[in-house]
Amino acid sequence: MPCGCRSPDFYAMKTRKLAFCGIVACLYAVVTLVTSSFAYGPIQFRIAEVLCLLCLFTPTAIWAATLGCFIANLFSPLPLDLLFGTLATLIGCIGTVKCKNKNIWLLPLPVILSNAVIVGIELAVAFYTRELFWTGFAISAAEVAIGEIAVLYLLGVPLMQVLRRTPAGTYLRTL
């Protein structure tokens, strides 16, 4: 290859990663919007959060889930979600990548904790007075954590266990 030129495989890989990001981001946004009656608010069961665990297979999923979360949060009744909800997803996904060689039951913890803390603060700021901030934060963080635990442990971990054993999981590791 001449100096400065890239192989066709390099461009094919970039295209596959970009397509993967687009598909996962779209899935995240669509699933959140279809389930919006219970995907937003203090007690939320955001089924699309399962896609954050795809970071187990490829770090490319960090950007895919974060973009999907941002798009979904464009429709949130709480404008602060655009910044704080998206930040919580980004931090949770990065934490998942850092934990990927650990026990599969520990994988959801970064996503659960980042959402509970960051979205808990967001909800406390939005819905509680200054005097009740810490009480509001504790309540909001617990509510968000309960929803995240339910979704990630009841749907996410079993799905990741299945993906680990299938050709799809092997393919995802190549991205």
Pin down the residues of each PLM region.
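Short, structured active-site "lid" loops
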Residues: 67
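Cysteine-centered motifs
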Residues: 3-5
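Hydrophobic transmembrane alpha-helices
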Residues: 12-56, 60-63
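Membrane-embedded alpha-helical hairpins and interfacial helices in multi-pass inner-membrane proteins
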Residues: 37-42, 50, 70-175
